[in-house]
């Protein structure tokens, strides 16, 4: 991960990876500049773009909930480090340093508009990915995939990461061929990534926030029709495997941490 570089103008500021600092400018945050295609999933507006730094996703921040109608894409200005894109950029940098499966942050920008600001974030595209929501809609999710989703969420929780909007649209799945030694054919495994860390943060390990996070994910799955064949079927074939993967991963992480710490003095 390269050092982040801050570039400022009269009304805006850009925080970017040092490797692209000489190239990135305000035009990088204009979808029309890239003739971009809309990307499904997550909050706000997102476009798939091809930049000199490679394929990326450009996201324009938009409010949700009751304030969306009143303020749209405007946020109250306080100071630069508290802006949505700068906070998310820094968090993604930290999560990448922890080797967690998140998009690589490329550049973040805010633009001052009176007492408000508007914001954008550019992250590297995770190629060949589908959202968990898309898999649910196509009824293409099995127990093994849900176990991997649970195990991945467990890694974030063990690292004290609270995801502000953990839902099926913000879980990306990538099928990767995995060749077993001496095997005649390839078998596919699924890699799981989490995206959209707007308002997310590192929290103290104590508390019930991990269970609240999981409950939010469960509600999103039910809202998407994952229990179309009945909630018992959903629990048995999808949710229980997710919980099993989560529990097994947490236990393994705790065991590894205890072994690394060594015996008590």
Where do the PLM segments sit?
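Juxta-kinase regulatory segment immediately upstream of eukaryotic protein kinase catalytic domains
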Residues: 1-36
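Conserved ATP-binding subdomain of kinase catalytic cores across diverse folds
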Residues: 23-130, 154, 158
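Charged catalytic carboxylate motif
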Residues: 87, 148, 216
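Conserved kinase catalytic-core helix
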Residues: 91-101, 132-169
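Short glycine-biased active-site loop of nucleotidyltransferases that positions the nucleotide triphosphate
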Residues: 113-115, 183-184, 206
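Conserved active-site beta-strand-loop modules that form the wall/rim of enzyme catalytic pockets
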Residues: 117-124, 162, 169, 190-193
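Conserved protein kinase catalytic/activation segment
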Residues: 170-195
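C-lobe/activation-segment region of protein kinase-like
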Residues: 186-265
């Amino acid at each position: 991960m390269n050092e982040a570089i801050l570039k400022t103008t009269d009304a805006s500021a850009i925080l970017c990876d040092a490797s692209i600092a000489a190239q990135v400018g305000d035009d990088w945050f204009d979808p029309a500049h890239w003739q971009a295609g809309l990307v499904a999933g997550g909050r706000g507006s997102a476009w798939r773009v091809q930049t000199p730094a490679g394929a990326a996703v450009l996201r324009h921040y938009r409010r949700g909930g009751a304030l969306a109608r009143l303020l749209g894409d405007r946020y109250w200005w306080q100071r630069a480090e508290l802006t949505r894109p700068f906070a998310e950029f820094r968090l993604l940098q930290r999560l990448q340093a922890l080797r967690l499966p998140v998009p690589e942050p490329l550049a973040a920008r805010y633009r001052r508009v009176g007492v408000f600001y508007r914001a954008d974030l550019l992250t590297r595209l995770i190629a060949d990915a589908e959202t968990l929501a898309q898999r649910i809609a196509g009824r293409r999710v099995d127990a093994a995939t849900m176990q991997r989703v649970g195990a991945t969420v467990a890694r974030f929780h063990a690292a004290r990461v609270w995801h502000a909007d953990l839902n099926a649209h913000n879980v990306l799945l990538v099928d990767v061929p995995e060749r077993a030694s001496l095997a005649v054919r390839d078998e596919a495994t699924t890699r799981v990534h989490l995206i959209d860390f707007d308002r997310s943060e590192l929290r103290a390990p104590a508390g019930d926030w991990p269970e609240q996070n999981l409950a939010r994910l469960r509600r999103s799955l039910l809202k998407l029709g994952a229990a179309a064949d009945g909630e018992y079927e959903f629990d048995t074939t999808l949710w229980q495997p997710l919980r099993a993967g989560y529990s097994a991963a947490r236990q393994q992480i705790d065991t590894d941490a205890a072994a690394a710490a060594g015996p008590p003095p």
